[in-house]
Amino acid sequence: MGTDELGRDLLTRVIYGSRLSISIGVLTALSAFVIGTIYGATAGYVGGKLDALLMRGIDIAYSLPDLLVMILVGVLIGRGTTGILIALALISWMGTARLVRAQFLQLKHEEFIEAARASGQSNLAVIFKHLLPNAIGPIIVALTFTVPSAILSESTLSFIGLGLSPPACSWGTLASDGLRALRIEPHLLLFPSFFIFITVLSFNFLGDGLRDALDPRTRL
């Protein structure tokens, strides 16, 4: 792969940068799972006016441009890993919340749920022992698509100069550095971009595979 303009080995920097890029993607997915599950489970299980109110909150959150939210968080918190994680968590949980709500609305009137309630189990026990385990399949599939989305978002922010700042090293910062030397050393941009592409594609294939494996219709 060669070296950059300062003589640093590009392959080493790409491998080192993968730790931060993939970590941001995974942590964003976990944050989306926690926030989205709590929010969506509350809306789907309680229902009624609270459900309508919480869903209007999601509609408002969806109306805010993602880039604007990330820029505002970057200005308020700073251009660091913490700011990136908070910004990505704020824009990634809504889809998970809607999915969890839909699963809970579908399952909460099933006979085994009614039997659990009739046996005297608490609401928390019904949610964590019966509803969530039966709804976890589609949620896991959705989270596998959240990881590449977060990696792309972080890379885009770093690429346009609004994400991580030196000495932090991610694929986005490497691509941003490579852009400045594109005419002289195009490999500085091409190799980080290639690894971003391969990683995003791999997670998308993983999501497709999990979706097929967990879809009960494919077992017929």
Where are these regions (language model features)?
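Alpha-helical transmembrane segments of integral membrane proteins
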Residues: 3-220
